[in-house]
């Protein structure tokens, strides 16, 4: 697959998330990018994007501030925490095998079961190998000259990618 085909395929896969057609046509020396995409967040959206992009042949790094996957279901462990939508809405539909491997115990699952499902997904598709945990992102900057994102972490590390996907969710900042 040539560079233009890869760029079109990547913009198609992640287009609904953050990329416009204009953004997918960036000019410049993108060879300076360490990854095709840097994803911030390893909740359900971040894991889904990692799975989809990896299966399309793209190099991906996920940065997660916690020490495991699950997003809001990792952080919110208070007694009685549960989803307010049917548990099936948390089920990924991209794999029939995955759907047949998991059976929700109740219509509106509690936090422990949803977190178990997130861990099952991470294990089933070996997602953790591309996730760097305990990495709090402090900034994401786009260099228009070379068409590369630099995502900086609190530790001082920088990660570069042709694309940056913010999968932090609406519950990632306390209020």
Residues covered by each model-derived region:
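Glycine-rich FAD pyrophosphate-binding loop
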Residues: 54-75
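N-terminal Rossmann-like FAD-binding beta1-loop-alpha1 element of flavoenzymes
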Residues: 37-61
């Amino acid at each position: 697959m040539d560079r233009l085909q890869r760029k079109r395929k990547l913009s198609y896969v992640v287009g609904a998330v953050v990329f416009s057609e204009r953004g997918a046509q960036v000019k410049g020396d993108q060879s300076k990018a360490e990854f095709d995409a840097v994803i911030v967040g390893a909740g359900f959206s971040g894991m889904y994007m990692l799975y989809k992009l990896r299966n399309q042949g793209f190099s991906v790094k996920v940065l997660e501030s916690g020490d495991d996957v699950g997003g809001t279901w990792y952080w919110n462990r208070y007694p009685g925490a549960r989803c307010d939508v049917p548990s099936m809405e948390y089920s990924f539909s991209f794999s029939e095998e995955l759907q047949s491997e998991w059976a929700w115990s109740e219509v509106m699952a509690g936090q422990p079961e949803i977190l178990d499902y997130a861990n099952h997904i991470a294990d089933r598709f070996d997602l953790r190998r591309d996730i760097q945990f305990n990495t709090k992102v402090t900034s994401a900057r786009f260099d228009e000259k070379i068409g590369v994102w630099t995502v900086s972490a609190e530790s001082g590390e920088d990660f570069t990618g042709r694309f940056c996907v913010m999968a932090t969710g609406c519950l990632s900042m306390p209020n």
